[in-house]
Amino acid sequence: MLRSLTCSSTITSTSLFFRSFRQLPRSYLSPSSSTTVVGASGRNIRRLSTLEAAGRRLFLRRGLKLLSAASRGLNGQFSRLSIRAVATQSAPSSYPGQDEAEKLGFEKVSEEFISECKSKAVLFKHKKTGCEVMSVSNDDENKVFGIVFRTPPKDSTGIPHILEHSVLCGSRKYPMKEPFVELLKGSLHTFLNAFTYPDRTCYPVASTNKKDFYNLVDVYLDAVFFPKCVDDVHTFQQEGWHYELNDPSEDISYKGVVFNEMKGVYSQPDNILGRVTQQALCPENTYGVDSGGDPKDIPKLTFEKFKEFHRQYYHPSNARIWFYGDDDPVHRLRVLSEYLDMFDASPARDSSKVEPQKLFSRPRRIVEKYPAGEDGDLKKKHMVCLNWLLSDKPLDLQTQLALGFLDHLMLGTPASPLRKILLESGLGEALVNSGMEDELLQPQFSIGLKGVSDDNVQKVEELVMNTLRKLADEGFDTDAVEASMNTIEFSLRENNTGSSPRGLSLMLQSIAKWIYDMDPFEPLKYEEPLKSLKARIAEKGSKSVFSPLIEEYILNNPHCVTIEMQPDPEKASLEEAEEKSILEKVKASMTEEDLTELARATEELRLKQETPDPPDALKCVPSLNLSDIPKEPIYVPTEVGDINGVKVLRNDLFTNNILYTEVVFDMGSVKHELLQLIPLFCQSLLEMGTQDLTFVQLNQLIGRKTGGISVYPLTSSVYGRDDPCSKIIVRGKSMVGRAEDLFNLMNCVLQEVRFTDQQRFKQFVSQSRARMENRLRGSGQGIAAARMDAMLNVAGWMSEQMGGLSYLEFLHTLEQKVDQDWEGISSSLEEIRRSFLSRNGCIVNMTADGKSLTNTEKYVGKFLDLLPENPSGELVTWDARLPLRNEAIVIPTQVNYVGKAGNIYSSGYKLDGSSYVISKHISNTWLWDRVRVSGGAYGGSCDFDSHSGVFSFLSYRDPNLLKTLDIYDGTGDFLRGLDVDEDTLTKAIIGTIGDVDSYQLPDAKGYTSLLRHLLNVTDEERQIRREEILSTSLKDFKEFAEAIDSVSDKGVAVAVASQEDIDAANRERSNFFEVKKAAL
């Protein structure tokens, strides 16, 4: 596994409007199986703490998840979805005229050329139903389709969310159990998922292959308009909820994919705060309930209400449809007309309108509890958050842009004043639930702090208000305003949406207004509002622009809700006891005949879930042929040379006049005892000052001159080698004309930053611990994966020390040590720098067009000449591992994260490309059916790290523990009993190639080239693996069973779970787990 640690050390841009998705839309796929967390390669990425695993299959893949240089979000405490314009060529000339559109049943409402994305956009209206269609045409090969319904719920039973899952479980034309999974298996999709927002449900797909794209479109259109689920109670029970009783003598339990997903959500304090915030700000409209579903309310949902919700809202009259890319605009309408013409007009568009929340006349205050562990001082684990609903109606683009700019000025970088003052106050550990939210009908702004002592809650509230008042009175530093403006303009020019298709980002941007019956074109046109904002700042000064916004929308706004979250170590157990009591009463109310019938129904559902679809049904799902697949891998044009004796990789790609660069240093001379300090060392490089610059000035300089700089460690096993690859990478980007500034600032960060600010370092430790604790609760599968890797290979051990449970334990100890031995810590940070900073073994990777690369070489040479010749330390041998054992990590949670792993190379397996096909097939069939569908977990997957030989299984938000491990152990028998036909095998191969050839932006291509070089992955070897993939046979599946058996027999199991479930497991299998309690 290749690992990269972000270390909270990125200084870079986010998006034009700097949206903070504090309550992210729920998606159909879990993070253990979802393309929403898939890197640019299409591979699943395991995140833990500061770790983002990136490139495990470099033999195969063009792309990897962008690491630190991909935006961290405004303050690192909440997630953001970058939405940027796309730089493409002008639109294709073939566009439906009015007559042609009329023949297909559409009228043209409006038409514009959007210069910001160099696209021709036409808004059509289907005359019969009123369905609106945005048809965006350009030369982007990554085609995107999306259909969005307005779906405002009236309660928290989770109807929109359960329906989002269920419509993808078979339809009129595709009557198998889950055509969605068939698409996962055998499509070249670059995006395939679905989202539930608080007031709408989105179904987007994307592909670069035209035939594949329209296959996806047809399956999705049939799924939303003609799903089987409205006539099949079993789908409702499977995806939503049902009573489960295996034997009348046993206890009844709740099961259901969404039910367990939301149990996981309601186990995370940050998520609870986000939901409380939304509901408290908007108690009178649809935002006052949880569209995802509250686990206490989900069992109140009936099948009849479920069916009625679909009938009411899933109608063309209530739909907005988006097309984007280089496909034929006429064909788009032709495909749509076949579906839309089957419907008449409906009042759904009127009945689904979201009513605005009326503004409060005075502020309100709410106190809520959240589940906490028993360890530590609970009095210091409060959270406090101030929240404002900014307006009683949507804002115009000009005001929205100005508020987004203001948001970035206040919170966007470590040097931003509101963020800086709160974190330096000592009143809390990290920001939480903070930033501007403008994706819903009415915009919101929040600022919160976690790790607050109970006697400091009032002080935090006062500090927030006093700081906002001071900012309104005094304004912002000129350099800060310039840095923010450069950040915005760089972001718009770069158009970097990471692994998400650009057309999807534009769709989500457009739909945020369109869904409320506003102009869908307006959000795509930023040039004039930005030009106007810059002119206002230049003419009147930034204070006259931003101070009135602070006054009007925050300080003088009575619609403010202050939320205090208090830790409650008994909350989780009380909720479990309450659920158990409800189920006991349900059972007590049943007769013997009722219980027998429930046990029969439980078995009936299980049999249906575990019975495969007949081959004829599977053939209904359209798919590609192997003849559609290129026989050769995609190559990155990389030239290896040197500058002043240092190796330089040049990736000649069009980047829209942007230079991307990585400078790589070897960690081989860093002492073992300093390893765990490296993430904090990386953060310190970017968030401490120099002799001449404060850290604020340094941050502003980076913001003004570049598109961002990040520093992070990277570790990976290397195929065929015992010693791991361990590097420290400095990554940056700038306009080509600013290349000299970029390399000067990189040099400044590496050589001039001083480790003298004790209080700032203490903040880093507290912030890192808070992030780790949040990830342990919400991404336990990543923690489990890291522990298993640390037991099985050296690179895994190194990574876990810097980003897993061991790192969290280290942070707890370090917090005390900062006060006791700061001089020693400061000296250790300096020693780390001396140990790796050297020209010797350094590699520079650059990505831009050839001319720009040539023009940049002189700045690279100057940078390299300033580096020390040799590192100060001697080479260190890394050979540590965690002891092999089955381990259970206790956290306060209502769901579990269950893993098992083993090294199949150790058992004699020789790498073959077929292993990638087989691994994907296991995830999409055996584990999907048994762990998710039958078991009720939100996700289950497997992963093969071809660099180390570690094969691992993971589940996510799982109600089970030992049962899931038994499923993993049955994988070998599953493979031996497999009887796949040619179509199924072809789908598995094509789906794997889809991962291998997934779409990449230029910076990701250049970064992938670097990683392949570091891990000795040649193009010749990639060709061999590709040929092995394409020639995979049933015999390969059978033979791989033996390798999987070694995981069952000799592997290690790690579970992140509740104390109750771990105790039950150890009772059932005497002392199966060694128990380790996480300090939360």
Curated annotation (Swiss-Prot):
Its EC number is 3.4.24.-. Mg(2+) binds at residue 704. Its cofactor is Zn(2+); Mg(2+). It is found in: Plastid, Chloroplast stroma; Mitochondrion matrix. The keyword Cell membrane does not apply. Its main location: plastid. Keywords: Chloroplast, Hydrolase, Magnesium, Metal-binding, Metalloprotease, Mitochondrion, Plastid, Protease, Transit peptide, Zinc. It is an enzyme of class 3 (hydrolase). SMART domains: M16C_associated. Zn(2+) binds at residues 161, 165, 261. The active site is at 164 (proton acceptor), 239. One of its GO terms (cellular component) is chloroplast stroma. Completely inhibited by the metal chelator orthophenanthroline. GO terms for biological process: protein processing. Binds 1 zinc ion per subunit. Homodimer. ATP-independent protease that degrades both mitochondrial and chloroplastic transit peptides after their cleavage. Also degrades other unstructured peptides. Specific for peptides in the range of 10 to 65 residues. Shows a preference for cleavage after small polar residues and before basic residues, but without any positional preference. Belongs to the peptidase M16 family. PreP subfamily. This is Presequence protease 2, chloroplastic/mitochondrial. It comes from Arabidopsis thaliana (Mouse-ear cress).
